[in-house]
Curated annotation (Swiss-Prot):
InterPro entries recorded: BrxB
Phylogenetic classification of the source organism: Bacteria, Pseudomonadati, Pseudomonadota, Gammaproteobacteria, Enterobacterales
Protein name (record): BREX protein BrxB
Phenotype seen when the gene is deleted: No methylation of 5'-GGTAAG-3' in chromosomal DNA, BREX no longer confers phage resistance.
Induction entry: Transcribed at slowly increasing levels as cells progress from lag to exponential to stationary phase.
Keyword Metal-binding among record annotations: no
Biological role: BREX systems (bacteriophage exclusion) provide immunity against bacteriophage. Part of a type 1 BREX system which protects against dsDNA phage. This system allows phage adsorption but prevents phage DNA replication, without degradation of the phage DNA. Methylation of bacterial DNA by PglX guides self/non-self discrimination.
Source organism of this protein record: Escherichia coli O9:H4 (strain HS)
Pfam family, one: BrxB
Length: 200
């Protein structure tokens, strides 16, 4: 079922991206140009469908990279010849144990450095991150964005995030009890007091 509020928010993304305050960080003070589009995890398919449309239209006017974080994890493991072994291990030990085992090979700094190695970040108008739902819990949004601060330079970053973002706390998927502090801009807030590009 289509979520009408989410559909409206999705329809606003392109115009927000085209604004100078996104592309040039105008009006954001000295804060880094990191943006989050949060959405209900159960609406993942609705977001994916809109992304196909959005990317086609953005390609007409912008040079950008759209990166699937889950695919990045797979690529990193494949480069080290670990992917097949990791798949077998997940079946044996479960996701939580696997996460602990991969804390070294897949720490957030290594993921950020891998992205910087694969993409000329300075040459992009902006970078879009998707696939956070599939990558969780191996990758946490607030930890990855913190690590990316060291490699993004002045290039704006937009993360599509299945969960909720209050302007200060990221709660993954439907886990409202888990609140992880991170300061970024909410690209298209809900209606009401939070309906501003810059969080209060």
């Amino acid at each position: 079922m289509i979520d009408p509020v989410l559909e409206y928010r999705l329809s606003q993304i392109q115009s927000r991206i085209n604004e100078d305050r996104f592309l040039k960080n105008n009006g954001s003070g000295n804060e880094i140009g990191f943006w989050i589009f949060d959405y209900p995890a159960q609406c993942e398919l609705q977001v994916r469908e809109h992304l196909k449309y959005l990317l086609r239209h953005l390609e007409k006017d912008h040079k950008f990279a759209c990166l699937n974080v889950f695919q990045i994890i797979i690529d990193m493991l494949n480069e080290r010849g670990l992917f097949e072994r990791v798949c077998q291990q997940e079946v044996k030990v479960g996701t939580e144990t696997l996460k602990k085992q991969l804390a070294g090979p897949l720490n957030q700094k290594k993921i950020a450095d891998f992205i910087a190695k694969k993409v000329d970040l300075a040459a992009q108008d902006f970078v879009i991150l998707t696939g956070m739902g599939n990558a969780w819990p191996l990758v946490r949004g607030h930890e990855l964005m913190s690590a990316l601060q060291d490699v993004m330079g002045f290039t704006p970053l937009l993360m599509f995030y299945p969960g909720t973002y209050s302007g200060y706390n990221l709660s993954p998927l439907t886990d409202t009890g888990s609140q992880n502090y991170y300061r970024a801009f909410r690209l298209v807030p809900d209606t009401g007091p939070a309906a501003t590009l810059n969080p209060q």
